[in-house]
């Protein structure tokens, strides 16, 4: 895959735009901003919806108790819940996309792990021209403990980053 | 003046876009990004070049010595230098703008004070739809002491913020 370049394409050249989506209203608003401002009917852009699932250790730890071993039923139920969540977020994002009659290819990428690292790595791997994301995504507790995902991406993603706040 | 709204305009509605410019290559690159990606020939947008001069206390302190009183000649020479700098940055930004044959009104605003506060206040006062800026603007020492201006604006500016890094 082409590596992300922090360089400019000429006007009218097709762009690869990654929008980081999650369960929040804000990320859907960021997607709307992107469709309103970064796409044009004259250019065939590609919009990549990126959802990052938390790593299993984090998603399980909130239920965890010392010495407790999860049964395979519990683990498969949690995996199903995680899949359902991905599907719900993607469907919601697709509904937002469908409202804009735009000349845009849609792709979907689901990552797994620490959101800020996965987003920056994916942007680079996909050769993205722009990353669009909400300001407060990926959960209050993670932000409080680890700092803001959007702060990190604004610094380290290898392309321009648009940070959108929910009104 | 209309207050900045963190809401979406319909596609084709005219936009007010603030680009924070300074002496850096990166801010000129941010301006190019803006002209390539956020303006369209079909829409009459307004691009506002915002330059923030440091407050006098900061610009003078690097020359200052305890007990030293500046003569009026020194002060007026420093004021002239500051005006020349504003003029040089604005001229450079206008040259970048002129390279893009775009349907964009150009306005210039010069602020004075702490860059991050002045940028956020100006965005709000001007009713801006988008703020575009470099990642590392407004000097190494100020960043090291006070944190990044772009970090602050990404969090507190009342509109979507685009952070552009120089390649």
Segments (PLM) and residue ranges:
Chain A
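A short acidic, glycine-rich active-site loop
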Residues: 70-88
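General small-molecule cofactor/ligand-binding pocket signal
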Residues: 48-50, 107-111, 162
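Glycine-rich, Arg-bearing micro-motifs that act as flexible, cationic patches
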Residues: 130-156
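Small/aliphatic-rich secondary-structure junction motif
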Residues: 5-75, 95-105
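Structural beta-alpha unit
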Residues: 1-13, 36, 80, 87, ...
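Small-residue (primarily alanine) positions within well-ordered alpha-helices
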Residues: 27-30, 123, 150, 157
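C-terminal helix/juxtamembrane-tail motif
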Residues: 158-167
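Short glycine-rich anion-binding loops that position phosphate/pyrophosphate groups of nucleotides
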Residues: 55, 113, 136-139
């Amino acid at each position: 895959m082409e590596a992300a370049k922090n360089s400019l394409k000429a006007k009218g050249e097709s762009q690869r735009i990654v929008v980081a989506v999650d369960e929040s209203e804000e990320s859907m608003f960021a997607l709307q901003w992107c469709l309103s401002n970064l796409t044009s009917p004259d250019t065939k852009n590609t919009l990549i919806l990126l959802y990052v699932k938390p790593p299993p250790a984090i998603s399980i730890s909130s239920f965890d108790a010392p010495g407790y071993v999860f049964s395979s039923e519990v683990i498969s139920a949690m995996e199903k819940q995680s899949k359902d969540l991905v599907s719900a977020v993607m469907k919601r994002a697709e509904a937002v996309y469908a409202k804009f009659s735009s000349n845009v290819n849609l792709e979907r990428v689901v990552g797994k792990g620490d959101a800020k690292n996965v987003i920056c790595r994916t942007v680079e791997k996909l050769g993205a021209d722009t990353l669009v994301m909400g300001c407060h995504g990926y959960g209050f507790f993670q932000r409080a403990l680890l700092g803001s995902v959007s702060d990190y991406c604004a610094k380290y993603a290898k392309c321009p980053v648009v940070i959108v706040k929910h009104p």
